Design a protein with these regions (language model features):
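N-terminal localization/anchoring segments of enzymes in phospholipid and broader phosphate metabolism
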Residues: 1-237
Length: 240
């Protein structure tokens, strides 16, 4: 594809790499570091620290962004970044964003943050898009650090401090290296859907010039508008 990069040709990974790129449309990318972050106690401080250190851009996409103490800490950090001149863009799913009222959208707009709803729910004209929801949870900072996993933004992921039996235990990952370029590419796919543009991701020079790592990763997008057999096709291709 046009987004391909130079991969480890001549190695045992090359045939598997070609199968994966053919099925997913995403190339194999090197990753300098992968850090596992369990629950909000470990995830949120890391995310906010990266937001506070951002110098150029922050792209955040989440299914749920709760209007609570955790949500406020993110809003305040994102506002401080924007005040420094950082390009801050936020996507929240139109249905997931309504899961825990009061919704945070008005607060984001009032604070002047560049926030979009993914397929917002409207009654007139009726637009529900029940199955066309965005469950992706991605944050990219300066094209250098990328986050993804199962955690939304909200107090319910603070397991140690929560007395709620429905608190959500989950995992997230912080990655650095060339794989972060693909996170930005995925974000702009959703951003362009929200705003009706064809803007492309900004590939970070710091990633382009970086020495290849021994750790190789690939982004695989999933959703109701994606090929639901993509993972199955990938496994069949690998083992055939």
């Amino acid at each position: 594809t046009s987004e391909s990069i130079q991969e480890p040709a001549g190695t045992k990974l090359r045939p598997l790499s070609l199968v994966g790129e053919s099925v997913t449309g995403f190339g194999l990318r090197s990753c300098d570091n992968i850090k596992l972050l369990e629950n909000g106690e470990n995830l949120y401080p890391a995310m906010i620290a990266d937001i506070e250190a951002a110098a150029d851009r922050i792209y955040l996409c989440t299914y749920i962004f709760q209007n609570d103490t955790t949500g406020d800490s993110f809003v305040n950090a994102l506002c401080r970044a924007q005040d420094r001149g950082v390009d801050v863009r936020i996507i929240i799913d139109g249905l997931g964003g309504m899961a825990y009222p009061p919704v945070i959208g008005k607060k984001l707009r009032k604070r002047g943050l560049n926030y979009k709803q993914f397929n917002p729910i409207t009654l007139l004209p009726p637009s529900l898009h029940i199955n066309m929801r965005n469950h992706r949870k991605i944050m990219v900072v300066d094209g250098k650090a990328g986050y993804t996993g199962g955690q939304n933004i909200g107090d319910r992921h603070l397991v140690k401090k929560s007395h709620n039996p429905k608190c959500a235990r989950d995992l997230h990952f912080r990655l650095t290296g060339k794989i972060v370029d693909e996170f930005e590419r995925a974000f702009f796919k959703d951003w362009n859907h929200c705003v009706g543009t064809t803007e492309k991701a900004i590939y970070s020079p710091s990633n382009t010039n970086r020495t290849e790592s021994d750790v190789w990763t690939r982004l695989i997008l999933d959703g109701p508008n994606e090929n639901l057999d993509k993972l199955n096709e990938l496994l069949v291709g690998v083992f055939s």
